[in-house]
UniProtKB/Swiss-Prot annotation:
This is Lipase maturation factor 2. Glycans are attached at residue 483. One of its GO terms (cellular component) is endoplasmic reticulum membrane. GO terms for biological process: protein maturation. Residues 680-694 have a biased composition (Low complexity). It is found in: Endoplasmic reticulum membrane. The keyword Glycoprotein applies. Keywords: Endoplasmic reticulum, Glycoprotein, Membrane, Transmembrane, Transmembrane helix. It comes from the Eukaryota. Involved in the maturation of specific proteins in the endoplasmic reticulum. Residues 661-707 are annotated as: Disordered.
Length: 707
């Protein structure tokens, strides 16, 4: 594969945007979720236990411990961290000089600090994925402080960037595997998508239309999902460029389709950012028009022969993937029904045996791929000119290669969770290494949509309030389904964490969601910050004048409406049926409610509020008051619009800064030096015929210096 400079720059740029979305989205929800009188107050997670300050920092690494020293309570410290994180990530998004290792270290520390007190509202896989990706960015990003006066493309950059590809492999492969290891009948029956669109956490309007697609197409979509998540990731580590590009576009296609049909915050965008690890500079430069090549006969004869040989290997590999997909999912065209029929043609035992067989070979394949990147880095270090620079490059290569090997090693523990027999065969030292760093969320296990919920109807909790216990009024949420006539919302990349947890709460008894009792308690109190999570516009909240005397919750089953046989569109988006009472009617000082709150310490008296007269609390309050009326999706979409407007104006007026190719200190082989002697026109022609495999680095740099 070719160089990764532009791909790495795209990865760091995209991750900066993801951090911005994550910090801003969480910031607007802090008072209601984690405030002194929020649903799950964060101050409860930072109680001093008699241990020393640094010992508590070690047990729960978080910058929030420094809040009291700044005169801030826990809530305001969280707001400060979110604002600093948003400002820093916005700067990294707009200015390439800020896409530095130290900047990404700060962003990672900021998000980890929030994660430590986030409790159930931050325990999502994409939060763990962002932390792991963010830590890898510290290794991937350039450290300008160590590069002094020149921007040197370090020999180790390919090694550290490889870790993002390994993370993407683990994410996608595990997401496909767990769907089958869970024994979920909808995944095995290929009918999961006939339920998915209406049962996902927060559907959008496109989900309603996707739900109307014919069953045979839904089943084929499940087969395609398995193909992309289980089969295609094996191509990530093969030395064939076109197969990797195919992998890139297939993964991106899947993520875009999920974005179109669902509200999954920044998760799919983050996955697309990880897909940059499969790109090379030649492919990115093609779209940026860095290369205007006109290949002429004679010069490309040997390259053509090499491409032909590579194609002879690529075609059978791709053909095998298609063949196995057709065979094991029994794909057949039904000409009479004009459809494509499919079924699972293997058993759970067959799949478990296959998984057990390939788990360790997949590790060795990945290890060989990493080893190849390390060897390439060693060769580049040896090619650096000058004894001092060669020594410096070698030391960096050695340090980052060891770091990459360590990250790869500890990631094997969560990776092998999908097959516990393989997990048990790992060396005890590997488990010990993982347990040592587990608190920092450096590596995690993944596996999305393990089981398809909502078979037989989407469970939904509807909260109701009353003044007299006779007349009940439903409390509508901004994002989750409630009123059957309300159109589903589009809120990407925002994640309304209360609405998401309401979806999880509906899947089981209320006792499995202790936070729900606290939520009801705050509504009975008329807590403005918690109400703001339910309705940003208080006038739409039915009890904005006076809090309700009683609150209860009912459980319903929801289904998408369908187009009738005549093709007429229904008037409502949903239909629903009452199932049972989810939470009994309670009031303030109700013994049942008090008992639930006391069991989980949710009625403890908060610490005294700190003064707002100090400069930092005063500024934080001003910012909060200014942003409070804005809905979170509007705020995030404004950021997106503003950023792209800036880039558009820069492009229009010629001020856009493209990712540059760093100057090299690598010496050229003798045959390369001979090719530099002809005139400049010939030199440019030669450099334009880059094969994308890193053989013409110096010539490409010469061309960039001229332009």
């Amino acid at each position: 594969m070719g160089e990764h400079r532009l791909a790495r720059s795209a990865f760091l740029w995209g991750l900066s945007g993801i951090y911005l979305f994550a910090f801003v989205s969480l910031y607007v929800q802090i008072p209601g979720l984690y405030g002194r009188e929020g649903i799950l107050p964060a101050w409860k997670m930072l109680r001093f236990t008699g241990k020393g300050f640094w010992e508590q920092m070690k047990d729960s690494p978080s910058l929030l411990w420094f809040g009291p020293r700044l005169g801030l309570d826990t809530e305001m410290t969280m707001e400060l961290i979110c604002l600093l994180g948003a400002l820093l990530s916005l700067g990294a998004l707009l200015f390439s000089c800020l896409r530095d290792s130290l900047v990404f270290l700060l962003l990672w520390v900021f998000y980890l600090s929030l994660y430590q007190v986030g409790q159930v509202f931050l325990y999502f896989q994409w939060d763990s994925l962002l932390l792991e990706t963010g830590f890898l960015a510290i290794l991937v990003a350039p450290l300008h402080a160590m590069r002094w006066k020149t921007s040197v493309w370090s020999a180790h950059d390919g090694v550290t960037f490889w870790l993002t590809r390994w993370l993407l492999f683990r994410l996608m492969f595990a997401s496909g595997v767990v769907k089958l290891t869970s024994r979920c009948p909808t995944w095995w029956g290929l009918t999961a998508l006939t339920y998915h669109y209406e049962t996902q956490c927060i559907p959008n309007p496109a989900a309603w239309y996707a739900h109307q697609l014919p069953v045979w197409l839904q089943k084929f979509s499940v087969v395609a999902t398995f193909f992309i998540e289980i089969g295609v990731p094996w191509l990530f580590f093969l030395p064939f460029r076109r197969l990797r590009l195919f992998s890139f576009y297939s993964q991106v296609l899947l993520q875009i389709l999920i974005i179109i049909t669902g509200n999954y915050n920044f998760f799919n965008l983050l996955t697309i950012v990880l897909c940059c690890s499969m790109l090379d500079d030649q492919h990115i430069a093609f779209f940026q028009r860095h290369k205007k090549t006109q290949h002429k006969g004679g010069i490309a004869t040997s390259a053509f022969s090499l491409r032909s040989l590579v194609s002879l290997l690529e075609i059978p590999i791709f053909g095998l993937l298609v063949f196995w997909t057709v065979k094991y999912f029994d794909l057949q065209i039904n000409w009479d029904k004009h459809s494509l029929e499919s079924r699972t043609a293997f058993t759970y035992h067959d799949f478990q045996q296959w998984l057990r067989t390939i788990t360790f070979p997949s590790i060795w394949i990945a290890a060989a791929s990493l080893g190849w990147e390390i060897l390439k880095g060693m060769y580049r270090s040896a090619s650096v000119r000058g004894f001092f620079w060669k020594l410096w490059s070698t030391l960096q290569w050695l340090m980052f290669s060891c770091a990459a090997a360590a990250m790869f090693t500890i990631s094997l523990v969560p990776y092998t969770y999908m097959d516990f027999e393989s997990n048990g065969q790992l060396w005890p030292e590997v488990h010990q290494m993982f347990n040592t760093v587990d608190r920092y969320q450096l590596v995690n296990s993944y596996g999305l949509f393990r089981r398809m919920t909502g078979v037989g109807g989407r469970p939904e909790v509807v909260v109701e309030g009353s003044f007299d216990r006779e007349t009940w009024t439903e409390i509508e949420f901004m994002y989750k389904p409630g009123n059957i006539s309300t159109i589903p919302t589009v809120i990407v990349p925002h994640q309304p964490r209360l609405d998401w947890q309401m979806w999880f709460a509906a899947l089981s008894h209320h006792s499995h969601s202790p936070w729900f009792a606290s939520f009801v308690y705050r509504l009975l109190q008329g807590n403005k910050d918690v109400i703001h999570l339910v309705q940003n516009d208080e006038s739409l909240y039915p009890f904005h004048a006076n809090p309700p005397t009683y609150i209860r919750a009912q459980q319903y089953k929801y289904w998408f409406t369908e187009v009738d046989q005549s093709g007429h569109m229904p008037k409502s988006w949903w239909r629903r049926r009452h199932v049972e009472e989810f939470f009994p009617a309670v009031f303030l000082d109700d013994p049942f409610l008090d008992n639930l709150l006391s069991q989980h310490g949710l009625k403890d008296k908060p610490p005294a509020r700190r003064s707002l007269d100090a400069p930092i609390p005063f500024v934080l309050k001003l910012i909060r008051d200014f942003l409070h009326p804005l809905p979170a999706p509007l705020l995030l979409h404004s950021f997106i619009f503003g950023i792209f407007t800036i880039y558009f104006l820069q492009a229009m007026f010629g001020g856009v800064s493209r990712p540059s190719v760093a100057k090299q200190r690598h010496s050229m082989p003798p045959n390369e030096k001979k090719k530099q002697k002809p005139n400049s026109g010939q030199g440019e022609s030669a450099s334009s015929k880059s094969s994308g495999h890193g053989t013409d680095t110096v010539r490409r740099n010469k061309k960039n210096e001229k332009s």
